[in-house]
């Protein structure tokens, strides 16, 4: 029933998008202008609210959005004017899609591996696999939001518009991915590193970011968040691990190019030999890439999953498809620091 209702809304979205009046509309000023126009057109956000896209979203407004997406009565919130955090927005939308159980599977798998995930881990994993979050255009990092910050109407509109595009196959894919998210037994040091990594799920992608706050140890940044190499630095170089020895010294360069080039070719870890907490490097030519061609990186969780900071922010993803094709090589800082034994 939910899929038929979403299909009806999607048909309405397409009709409005292709109409002459909409085609002649003046370009908006919000990064999510198209999505704001969509949710107003289908009646799940008031035009007056959409006109102030950077205003914090209220519980009452979120209730209206969810009711519109699910074709149910608007729930009477006891605090309709209260603000909604980004984490709460994602959790509510994941629930509206009927994917709460899938979110629980992600969380339980991380708990079983001993990684002590935060309560938002599962819903943030699902929200990002669905594409409900996105990186803002260059120059707008100041608009990025951390999980505990109030969500804006623009963020809610983007997510709702994305949901209108989803079909039954999309939700089925999430259910299948959640069922496949089973992590291996890890060593004490792998557990330490991965526990740090999963703590940051849901933080936004911020260019040149390497801290969860503006006050980075390496200088101020526009907003708390990470780019792909900055996320790895935060986990491996900034975090203070008891008895970590030389671990922070293993990574010298800050970029993907530098970190991938610091490991000699003979010590690069191939795809089939990856272990939890290994660094992953990606390049356009896959294993034939040169360090200068490595343009993305992440941290391996195990059993075909990794965590990284991408256009969806800090998220987990399966190491398959596009990522498997572009996988260049891995690196094992824990071995370099003498904290794990050779395989």
Residue ranges and their predicted role:
Residues 15-17, 21-33, 40-59, 63, ...:
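Feature responds to low-complexity, polar/acidic, surface-exposed segments characteristic
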Residues 38, 68, 95, 99, ...:
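Glycine-rich, acidic and aromatic/proline-enriched surface loops and short helix-turn segments
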Residues 39, 119, 125-128, 187-192, ...:
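Extracellular/periplasmic catalytic domains that process cell-envelope and extracellular macromolecules
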Residues 156, 162, 247-248, 252-260, ...:
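Aromatic- and glycine-rich peptidoglycan recognition patches
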Residues 206-276, 286-287, 326:
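Catalytic cysteine-centered active-site loop
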